[in-house]
Every structure is written in structure tokens, then in C-alpha cells.
Amino acid sequence: MSTAVGSSKPALKASGDAPERRYVSSAEYAARARDFRLDAKRRATGAPHRRSQRYIDVDYHHPLEDWLSNHLFRAFLGWLAADRPGGPHLRRVLQTYGDPKLSWADRLRYALPHYLIRRFKGSVTDERFRQRVGQHGPTVLGLVNTAQSVARFGLSAPQRFVAPLIIVWNFTQQCNLSCAHCYQSASHGKQPDELTLRERLNLVDRAAAAFVPMIAFAGGEPTLDPDLLPVLRRCREHGIHTTIASNGTTLTPERVAAYAEAGVQYFELSLDSVDPERHDRFRGQAGAWRRTVQALRNIADHPDPNVRAGLAACITQDNFDEVEDLIRLAIDLKCCAFCHFNFIPVGRGRGMTRHDLTPRQRDWLLRRLNDLAQSRQIGVLSTSPQFGRTCLAYAPIDGMVAASHLGAAGGEKARVVAKYVGGCGAGRCYMCIEPNGDCTPCVYMPHRVFGNVRQRSLGELFRGNPYWDLLCDRDRRDGHCQVCSFKNYCGGCRARADAYYGDPAGADPGCLFNEDMWDQLVAADAQVASPADVAAG
């Protein structure tokens, strides 16, 4: 029986088809993780494991959760965050906290919210709070968005949002490479229906009005489009955080400086191998590796230390054996982050399912990335939602925990935040905008178009699309994703479920807890190879 990508789910194997394989459930995984790592001294001496040093507890709680669940406080929050002429009160509250020049009228008006900030900001000094929150445009936008969301929908795990926290904007279809796995199926020329500069600037204005704190520019290759600089400058005017995902081949020192002046502080450059020939063959152009590595050096040499680069690698069967070398290269090139991209068979990668990792390979990879994150040698990002589960299970209480699209942070409070914003954010806390203005839940779900920015507001598109309720409800899942102990922190990759089963609510067959479903795919489709679980144990 053939099971092409996007077709219906394969029938279950008959019990006598193959020897029974030992599968792992999330409950067993959690129990095993609790006693996973004793330090070397305790292990050597045989000293008992102290429960205060536990590594996993999926029921973290913070007093702020009680406040946010109170209907009276939600009403107060709604009043603070409501949009009005001059902007929401909450924006003014955040921007004026700790300001010695604040008028007595404003001191009285904002006494209660300022008191709450003092109560919940912990050991952060007033000056530090002003620098990192009140005077940081993206944080203010994000907090207003979150406050409006809690006021409207209540506190929910995962949290529903009135507007996306992140927009990934595939700025143009044009690209100068021909990557074998391109999710966008990018071309060497622009498409005739791409947004005009006027439409692009208007879209930024609308995103700011909806309190969208971050826009990530991708493509195609966004740096080929001359409209990118004026659009970046408009984002900077509104306080929107911007990043550029690029192949790096155009990023000369002069271009890096121009984008940095326009407000970009993070560049994410794709590099698939430490072997130049291997990378160039995959990317379809000789010399690509050399130019990308030089671009990473150009960014590292920029005089502003806040301008940084991440090395992004899509890990497949073709470069799984290079993971350690890629990490070392990222560190040697002074990157601030190593970014793992989950392989998803869409776009030009649609016929490459045999290159996908097995669940056990992916689990090994994520555990290795967690170890790297805890070492703090370099930041770690992953588009695999299972990374949040891995951090929760194998990081110490004060260790780094991934909150999916929002990065990672340390400590118990980070685990509370991850409960609400962690895991797959497709169509829930982030959305994709295509070069022509079409909107989809995720860059890896290009066929799930739910509207166009030329016709409707961002809020209407985001909350009114046919996938929103489904993607916000993790009880509506198939396979182990429905009952998983970690579903608040993961939820499975909806794009992978959609690519393999044609169903955004399907199980993610790349997860260790759905390994039986992966085995069924392998057995049902000869195209999906079953490679050895190299280094995956």
C-alpha cells in the first residue's frame, strides 16, 4: 500500500506482521526523566537523589496565574490594554514606571498597576525594568497584545491571542539559490502579484496597530528585494522587532551595516554542512558555502555587539552525522545561536520524506541540543516543538527552557511561561504572510490559505480563519499528541501532521511517543526509508 505525503492515514498493522516493538509513552518518559541526571559525585558515591533537585514537574505554578484567572482583574486588565486615542493606558504604565519626572496626576492614575509591577518584577531594579521593558518597543507591544488576549479569552493553556506575537513574512518569491528542500519552492524571479511597497508599508502600520511585536523576514531571499530597507525602517519607527532569515550570499559588510541601521539585530543564516561541496550541491550553487560563512564573519565583525547571527541548519539523514561539527562551526564563527530546523516534507522537499529523521534520531538530537543550551556556550533554537518537552524533562529547575517561537529562558518562571506560549504556535501565536499577501498558519503549510491582507484586517484574518479553534485546542489531536503529558509545552508539529496525514489535527509522526505511527508509515510506503538510528540509542 502506498502512502504519499498528504494522503489519508495508513491502516494499522496486523499484530502478526512484525515482532512487537517496545514503544515509549510520555508518562514513562516523564518518570524516567525525573531520575535522569545525578551529578558525577552522587553517581560515584551512590548518594541518594535529592527531590529538591528534581528535573521534571509539569505542574509549575506562579501567583500571577491566580491574578490573571480572576475575572475582576481580567476586567481591569482589559481596561488598561484597551486601544484608545493616544494608545492604551498599559503602554503608558510600562513606559512611565520608575520615571522620577512622572507628574503627580499620573502617579495617582497609575498607582495600582505600578504597585503590581513592583510586586511581580522580582529582583529586577527599576532602572533595569525601564531599559528591558518600558523603553523596549517590542516588549511593550507584546505585553499589550498579551494583556488584551487574557482579558478577552481568559488564561488558557495554550494561550489564545488576539493577534500574532510573530509574523513570518515571506517577503519575496525571488531567490538566487535552488535549495533541494525549499518549503517555499522559491524561484529566480519575483512573482507578478507580490505586494507593492505602498502595500508593504501599510501592512507594517496595521501590524503595529494590532500590537504585533515581531516580524521575521524570510523568502525566497528577502535581501534581493529593494523594498526591504524602507519596510525595515517603518518597523523600527513602530518599535517592532525585526529579524532576517537569509542564505547570506548577499550580506557584505556594507549591507549588514545598512540593515543594522534599519533596526535589524538578528540575522539567521542557513548552512547545511561543514563540507563546502556538500552544502553547495544541496543549495544548487557553487561558492554558496564560502559566501555564507563570510557573511557570518561580517556580522560577527559589526561594531555593534547587539547585532548578532544565528547559524540555521535543517537536520536530515543527509547531515545528521554532522551535528557536532555544525555546532562547533557556529561557536567558532561567534554565532549567538545554533538553530535547528525541523525537516517538513513540503515545497520542493515534498518528495524527500526518505530524508526525514526517525523519532529516535530526533529525540537524540533534541537531547543533545538541550545539553548545549544548559551549557550556555551558545543559544539554541529549534522549530521542533518537542524541544520544549525535552528541556522540561532534562533541564534542572533553574536551567534553560524553550518557549518555542519566543526563544528560551532560565528558571521556574520560564516553565510557567512555556506552559502558555510553548510548543507549536502555528495559527495560534504566529502566522505566515506570503509575498502576495496570502495568509497561512505556518510557512510549512502553504496550501492552508485563509485569506489575504489586501482584503481583511490582521485580527480578522488571524482569529477568523477556519483553523484557529482547532490549532488553539490541543485536546483535538490524534495519536499520543491527544493524551501526552507534555502537550501544553509541545502539542506536536501541526505542519508535519498535515504533511504526512493531510490533517492539521493529526499526530506528529516524528515524536518518540508516536513511534508506532512512524513505523506504520515506513511499512506502508517504500519511499519513506527506515535508516538506522545513528547515535540515537
Model-derived features: positions:
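Conserved alpha-helical substructure of the radical SAM core
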Residues: 87-258, 262, 266, 357-358
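Flexible, acidic/Gly-rich N-terminal and inter-domain linker regions that tether
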Residues: 2-165, 536-537
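C-terminal accessory region of radical SAM enzymes
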Residues: 2, 302, 359-415, 438-491, ...
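Short Fe-S-cluster ligation motifs
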Residues: 203-219, 472-473, 508-537
